[in-house]
């Protein structure tokens, strides 16, 4: 099995379906913290190198990131996958402003809007499959309670398909449950679990097939507070992949290693930084 291909896409996305709280709020904050680290350490560019389980470079893979002004461009190309350019633009305050994802046959643009307190208010995504001219528009509209915690979200697709999402908080104010309804039908509940420091540890949903709660993701943290590993269960799979993270002295990610359920190394991605 080659490391590039579907597994490479998982390391770039790492988000299962639904998980609106994780995808819209948590992941966005993580990307903004990475951007802040890039700016703080005056990162100019990053080279991504992919290696197979035997340590040999992954054939046909190239990857790099370029920092220019208030934007970060990530370019990747892998055997069997379309060449991709992801451009993330940030406000002077470090908030995500726009993300575009472009390949030979696909283009997606997400515009972010915030309220006066800097809380995410709306994400408007427009995606186009250029080869067959299909166009989708999806908007996520967020609302918050008096304490500034997420209370609900509307997902509106193509102006006429609405999913209502509400959030249940735990005693510490963390989002504990994500309950969605579409066409008057309840969708599977997403559960979020945390450690004593309110760090996200598990994202779980009920499996109709297994008739029990099963994880989508499991997170672990090092003594420095950084994420040390993330377990990913691909949609519709009984298997999982686990990503192990290493960081350099500046707190920047230096390596991502992928291991299988059988604890076999499948491959790794290394990051080399150039500074201004």
Regions found by a protein language model. Give the residues of each.
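Buried hydrophobic residues that stabilize the cores of well-folded domains
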Residues: 19-276
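Bacterial Sec-dependent N-terminal signal peptides
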Residues: 1-23
């Amino acid at each position: 099995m080659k490391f590039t291909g579907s597994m490479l896409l998982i390391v770039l996305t790492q988000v299962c379906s639904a998980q609106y709280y994780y995808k819209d709020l948590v992941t966005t904050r993580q990307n903004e913290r990475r951007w802040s680290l890039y700016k703080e350490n005056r990162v100019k560019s990053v080279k991504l190198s992919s290696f197979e389980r035997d340590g040999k470079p992954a054939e046909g893979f190239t990857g790099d990131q370029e920092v220019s002004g208030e934007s970060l461009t990530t370019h990747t190309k892998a055997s069997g996958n379309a060449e991709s350019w992801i451009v993330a633009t940030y406000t002077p305050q470090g908030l995500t402003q726009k993300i575009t994802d472009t390949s030979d046959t696909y283009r997606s643009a997400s515009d972010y809007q915030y309220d006066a307190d800097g809380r995410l208010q709306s994400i408007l995504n427009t995606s186009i499959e250029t080869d067959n001219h299909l166009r989708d528009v999806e908007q996520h509209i967020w609302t918050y309670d008096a304490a500034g915690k997420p209370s609900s979200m509307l997902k509106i697709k193509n102006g006429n398909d609405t999913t209502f999402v509400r959030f249940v908080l735990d005693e510490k104010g963390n989002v504990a449950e994500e309950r969605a309804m579409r066409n008057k039908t309840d969708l599977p509940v997403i559960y979020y679990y945390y450690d004593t420091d309110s760090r996200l540890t598990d994202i779980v949903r009920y499996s109709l097939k297994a008739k029990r709660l099963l994880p989508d993701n499991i997170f672990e943290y090092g003594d420095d507070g950084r994420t040390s590993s993330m377990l990913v269960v691909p949609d519709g799979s009984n298997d999982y992949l686990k990503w192990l993270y290493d960081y350099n002295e500046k707190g920047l990610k230096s390596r991502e290693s992928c291991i299988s359920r059988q604890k076999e190394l499948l491959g790794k991605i290394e990051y080399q930084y150039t500074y201004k």
